């Protein structure tokens, strides 16, 4: 193993923010070796990226700059809705958006993404089959494997998958039993009114609400990840009514915010990232991660190249990194 590989692995192992994307002790990045796309003029380029604070980190950008030779790097932490607003408003401040897959249509349909050739990614050969082999349960376009490609020939990518995980429910075992917590409906249970939490991103919240509504007998949506317009309208009514009734202590959007709200006891049940639950437990506070009867919510995040960037090679190198 090379020194570069050791440094990369050490960086990921000890980065608390990046660990917010890991399952247990596994590394969240899909590639386990250090192979970076190099370009002769990379030193003349810069990388300006935007995304969640758990992927956009100075120590990661610093390491990328050192190993790639790119001239400059800068990162802006923002929620997905805020980042989308900036990019669709025509901002020229970014070369790359570390986007979550469900928001890909927003930049594809508005021509704000420039596809990345798969052949330019040395690490593509190591990608997990999660992103290359479709499941027979749904049509390919309803799965991540059918959404990341810009062409039917599968030669260019609208998003290069970098991290992925499955989210569940974080809860205080001193307040809820495992049986109570092991359903998405727990977040909306009046018993925990004023002490539950929900992610502020509507594309996340809606899917979780629909799973809860199915369990509560309020809907019968076959694929909560791809609801119809009518099903979305019903979920919106449900969420608005719950918010007006004071169900939620907070609509959280950041890792640190989530940890603080759970550790303080202000939120006793919420949708949560597993490492946030681990961070609460590390403080000596009671916190567990549920196994929802409806299943977990899967997601994938990765770099997308913003159309019109003059730093294309830097974005490709970062995606490969």
Model-derived features: positions:
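Early extracytoplasmic/lumenal segment of secretory-pathway proteins
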Residues: 38-110, 259
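Alpha-to-beta junction loops
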Residues: 90-98, 112-113, 192-194, 264-270
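Oxyanion-binding "anion nests"
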Residues: 254-275
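Extracytoplasmic/periplasmic substrate-recognition and gating elements
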Residues: 272, 276, 281-321
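N-terminal secretory signal peptides and thylakoid transit peptides that target proteins
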Residues: 2-23
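Extracytoplasmic ligand-binding site segments that recognize negatively charged/polar headgroups
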Residues: 55-57, 108-257
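Hydrophobic residues within well-ordered alpha-helices
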Residues: 87, 261-263, 305
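Short beta-strand-to-loop elements that line the ligand-binding cleft
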Residues: 72-79, 98, 246-254, 290-291
